[in-house]
């Protein structure tokens, strides 16, 4: 689907997808490739179901394992030709985020991949994730934010405590970079779809990171569905998360 990125053909809009967003040709093309590969797995006798942001739920003979597919996380970037978008795959053995036992986030532009298996750690490019040490303990080096304009205003206390901010426009890639320590903190101060986070939250957990909503509640028990939404505050370790949560708490 890369040849479609940033083109008029790739921006052609279709009906609203299962996730509630308008499906574009770049989404359809990427999903077709993924579903074709999963159908080939089913033909070899594997039983599972697939839940895609574009086409919804499809059964291949069993409710679980359930494969979550976001074929293009960062669709607007892809439409505009901004090379920051990725493929998110998560495999669950139950209905909640905590039930994610395998996850993959692929940067479709660079080919860089983050993977995680429950209780087996997280990897970036095949190597176990090693978080970059933080030098300045007084401020966050880089704060990552969700991309809606209101997020900047709502996260202002965190912004004022940070040296730099980054807004990638891809939830999966943002959390993946947090898991590997690129972001000291990532914040989505407005409710975002839990479905988009499933693979990245496993990466974060397996790498030793922490994720909660802005009130400090774990997001793991939430249903990993297309209609479940939550705020999000995550960091690559408990110390940074506690610091960020304290700052957000002062705002309330």
Protein language model features and the residues they cover:
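Short His-Asn-centered micro-motif
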Residues: 51-54, 69, 106, 145, ...
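Short, conserved micro-motifs enriched in small and acidic residues
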Residues: 21-29, 79-81, 169, 194, ...
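Buried hydrophobic packing segments
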Residues: 34, 38, 87, 91, ...
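DPxDG-like acidic metal-binding loop motif
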Residues: 61-119
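N-terminal subdomain of lithium-sensitive/metallo-dependent phosphomonoesterases centered on the IMPase/IPPase/PAP
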Residues: 1-72
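Residue-level signal for inorganic ion chemistry
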Residues: 27, 75, 116, 178, ...
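An extended, acidic
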Residues: 41-42, 120, 131-252
């Amino acid at each position: 689907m890369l040849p479609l990125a940033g083109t008029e053909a790739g921006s052609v809009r279709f009906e609203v997808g299962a996730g509630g967003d308008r499906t574009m040709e770049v989404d359809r093309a990427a999903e077709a490739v993924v579903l074709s590969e999963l159908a080939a797995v089913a033909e070899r006798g594997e039983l599972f179901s697939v839940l895609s942001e574009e086409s919804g739920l499809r059964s291949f003979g069993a409710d679980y394992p359930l494969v979550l597919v976001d074929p293009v996380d960062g669709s607007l970037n892809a439409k505009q030709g901004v090379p920051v978008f990725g493929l998110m795959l998560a495999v669950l053995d139950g209905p909640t985020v905590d039930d994610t036992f395998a996850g993959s986030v692929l940067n479709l532009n660079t080919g860089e991949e983050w993977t995680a298996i429950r209780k087996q750690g997280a990897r970036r490019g095949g190597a176990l994730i090693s978080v970059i040490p933080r030098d300045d303990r007084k401020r966050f080096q880089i704060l990552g934010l969700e991309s809606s304009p209101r997020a900047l205003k709502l996260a202002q206390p965190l912004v004022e405590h940070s040296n730099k901010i980054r807004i990638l426009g891809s939830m999966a890639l943002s959390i993946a970079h947090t898991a590997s320590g690129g972001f000291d903190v990532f914040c989505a101060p407005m409710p975002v779809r839990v479905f988009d986070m499933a693979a990245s939250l496993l990466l974060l957990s397996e790498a030793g990171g922490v994720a909660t909503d802005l009130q400090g509640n774990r997001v793991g028990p939430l249903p990993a569905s297309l209609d479940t939404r939550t705020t999000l505050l995550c960091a690559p370790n408990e110390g940074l998360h506690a610091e960020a949560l304290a700052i957000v708490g002062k705002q309330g």
